[in-house]
């Protein structure tokens, strides 16, 4: 039997800046974008900046499956993260790896889009996990996680998943069973 659980919130955060104007993306929110941009940008063969994708799976679908596991209605579940490439991949390297980690803090999806002018800063960004006009920003804090630029997330046994690509489709089909099991056991408080 297969269940599909869709995210309740998703966004990406960007550590770079506009290559033409120099305006930073570090405080910009992309919470309402339809596309999650996961990339590393190189300028003249030098690393320029990267993005990270944030996905939240809280909600009734996940709670229902969680309860079914506790009640032993579902035994030995497997969890997969599936994301699909939306644009062409002509600039993608032939060999690369992606990692998935649970983050140590909650975050706010926000209301921004890439095309917003002026840019929207309401919600999470590379610099902040939450920000609203007229309020103090809530920065990414270290809650027993390790610093990984832009967010703090857990690492180590059971807290990471990865997928490698070698001349392969960029679609993500990653086994995240260990990460989800840690969350279900209460090891990850977020």
What are the residue ranges of the model-derived segments?
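Secreted, disulfide-rich extracellular signaling modules
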Residues: 1-190
């Amino acid at each position: 039997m297969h269940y599909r659980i869709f995210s309740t919130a998703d966004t990406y955060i960007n550590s770079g800046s506009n290559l033409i104007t120099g305006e930073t993306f570090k405080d910009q929110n992309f919470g309402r974008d339809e596309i999650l941009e996961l990339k590393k940008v190189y300028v003249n063969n030098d690393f320029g900046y990267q993005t990270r994708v944030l996905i939240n799976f809280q909600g009734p679908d996940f709670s229902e499956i969680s309860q079914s596991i506790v009640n032993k209605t579902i035994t030995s579940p497997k969890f997969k993260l599936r994301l699909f490439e939306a644009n062409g991949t002509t600039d993608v390297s032939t060999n690369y790896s992606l990692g998935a980690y649970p983050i140590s803090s909650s975050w706010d999806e926000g209301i921004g889009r890439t095309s917003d002018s002026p840019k929207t800063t309401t919600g999470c960004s590379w610099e902040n996990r939450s920000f609203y006009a007229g309020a103090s920003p809530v920065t990414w804090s270290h809650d027993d996680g390790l610093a990984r630029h832009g967010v703090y997330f857990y690492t180590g046994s059971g807290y990471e998943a990865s997928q490698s690509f070698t001349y392969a489709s960029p679609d993500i089909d990653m086994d995240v069973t260990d990460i989800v099991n840690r969350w279900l056991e209460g090891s990850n408080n977020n």
